[in-house]
Structures are given as structure tokens and as C-alpha cells.
């Protein structure tokens, strides 16, 4: 059975995560405040960010940068800036 939460990112009730996807206190906050749809949007941006900036997840500084971008995107409403990327026009 799915959980319904108020998603901080989408600013509406939505289906919550099935389990905690990220460790620690931040993971608990994501579990309680971020919907599956919002998390999927983040994963898409995260993939683009890792590829375009050539981030190495074995590098602690790169992981910290990615975590900061995640918090900014999910909780502060800031979009991820990827140099040279222009979003498609939605018709």
C-alpha cells in the first residue's frame, strides 16, 4: 500500500517513497517530504549533472557537490544549472 505525503518540492499531496533512499537525517527528510515523482525528476537531473561535469562518485568532494545540488533542487526550489543545456520547449 502506498503512502501519501505532502511533497515539499511539488507543493501538493503525492505518493511517497516506499523506503528511505538516502542515508542519515537528510534521507529521513527526503523520505518524509519528497514524493516518488519529485525523486524521479531529481534522478534525471542528477544523471545529467554527473555526466556533464564528469563527476566521480568515488571522490568525496564530488559527492558533497552532488548532495548540495540535491538539497538545493529538492528543498530550495533551485534548478540544476548544467552548462550548455537548454531545456526543450514544452508545447
Swiss-Prot record:
Coiled coil: none annotated. GO terms for molecular function: iron ion binding. The keyword Disulfide bond does not apply. Changing residue 7 to S: Strong decrease in activity. Keywords: Iron. This is Probable Fe(2+)-trafficking protein. The gene is yggX. Could be a mediator in iron transactions between iron acquisition and iron-requiring processes, such as synthesis and/or repair of Fe-S clusters in biosynthetic enzymes. Necessary to maintain high levels of aconitase under oxidative stress.
Amino acid at each position: 500500500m502506498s503512502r501519501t505525503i505532502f511533497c515539499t518540492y511539488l507543493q501538493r499531496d503525492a505518493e511517497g517513497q516506499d523506503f528511505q533512499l538516502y542515508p542519515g537525517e537528510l534521507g529521513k527528510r527526503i523520505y518524509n517530504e519528497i514524493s516518488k515523482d519529485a525523486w524521479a525528476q531529481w534522478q534525471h537531473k542528477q544523471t545529467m549533472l554527473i555526466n556533464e561535469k564528469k563527476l566521480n562518485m568515488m571522490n568525496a568532494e564530488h559527492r558533497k557537490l552532488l548532495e548540495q545540488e540535491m538539497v538545493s533542487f529538492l528543498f530550495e526550489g533551485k534548478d540544476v544549472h548544467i552548462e550548455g543545456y537548454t531545456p526543450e520547449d514544452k508545447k
